[in-house]
């Protein structure tokens, strides 16, 4: 189940970096927005988590588009610094707003996703549901990269000046890439919250952003199944190290 969650989340950074050439070190922020939005709606407002994860994904998209407005004017290194700062702002916000987010101790007893009364209360059920969403995300991603939008992303990555010369609105397409990336990662955040039923700010620190980027690079950028390979590979490595630590091999 964790593999499909992280595969979905890694699809966002892979699209942003692999196809549009924008380096974001803040995917954990969108992961957090999706997770906390869905968790808050479910625990405090009584919203069905099935709808909550999509609302969280939508808010993550809005946040991505808002960040993209100033970010579209920045070059790679300054863009990375800006996204790191955004990630820290989100991290500090969820720490500070204890009445809403639970603060440092986190949020507990987050309900499982329920579809027409059928509760996804096991890892296998969550795996199947997450796999369906992952397949849909990959279909959307594949359609995007094969469309005019995808070709515009690649043109911007290869040569921004040349892309502008061909009539590509660079700022608009950069913003679109940011928004789509945030949408995918926010969706994964919602899935994560209702899978583990407990979230805290430490789950969404800068290490999480590095993990997403590492998975994208490990699986191979500009690849449809790269996020799956990267997530599965690093999750396997993590399990091996935990096994060695437990049994002191």
Where in the sequence are the language-model features?
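Transmembrane alpha-helical segments in multi-pass inner-membrane proteins
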Residues: 28, 54, 64, 174-249
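Extracellular/periplasmic helix-loop junction at the C-terminal end of a transmembrane helix
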Residues: 86-119, 150, 243
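Alpha-helical transmembrane segments of multi-pass integral membrane proteins
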Residues: 1-5, 26-27, 31, 35-38, ...
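Helix-loop-helix "hairpin" substructures at the membrane interface of multi-pass membrane proteins
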Residues: 121-200
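Membrane-helix interface segments
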Residues: 23-29, 45-51, 74-80, 122-126, ...
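Alpha-helical transmembrane segments within multi-pass membrane transporters and channels
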Residues: 45-88, 229-233
């Amino acid at each position: 189940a964790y593999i499909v969650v992280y595969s979905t989340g890694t699809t966002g950074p892979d699209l942003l970096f692999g196809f549009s050439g924008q380096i974001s070190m803040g995917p954990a922020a969108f992961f957090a927005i999706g997770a906390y939005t869905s968790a808050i709606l479910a625990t405090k407002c009584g919203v069905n988590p099935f709808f909550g994860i999509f609302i969280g994904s939508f808010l993550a998209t809005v946040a991505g588009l808002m960040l993209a407005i100033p970010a579209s004017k920045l070059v790679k290194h300054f863009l990375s610094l800006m996204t790191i700062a955004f990630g820290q702002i989100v991290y500090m916000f969820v720490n500070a707003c204890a009445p809403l987010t639970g603060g440092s101790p986190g949020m507990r007893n987050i309900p499982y996703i329920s579809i027409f009364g059928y509760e996804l209360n096991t890892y296998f059920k969550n795996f199947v549901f997450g796999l369906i969403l992952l397949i849909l995300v990959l279909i959307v991603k594949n359609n995007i990269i094969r469309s005019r939008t995808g070709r515009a992303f690649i043109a911007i990555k290869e040569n921004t000046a040349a892309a502008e010369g061909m009539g590509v609105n660079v700022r608009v397409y950069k913003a679109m890439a940011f928004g789509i990336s945030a949408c995918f990662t926010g969706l994964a955040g919602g899935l994560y919250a209702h899978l583990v039923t407990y979230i805290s700010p430490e789950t969404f620190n800068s290490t999480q952003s590095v993990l997403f980027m590492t998975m994208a690079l490990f699986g191979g950028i500009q690849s449809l199944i790269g996020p799956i390979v990267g997530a599965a590979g690093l999750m396997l490595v993590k399990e091996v190290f935990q096994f060695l630590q437990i049994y002191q091999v």
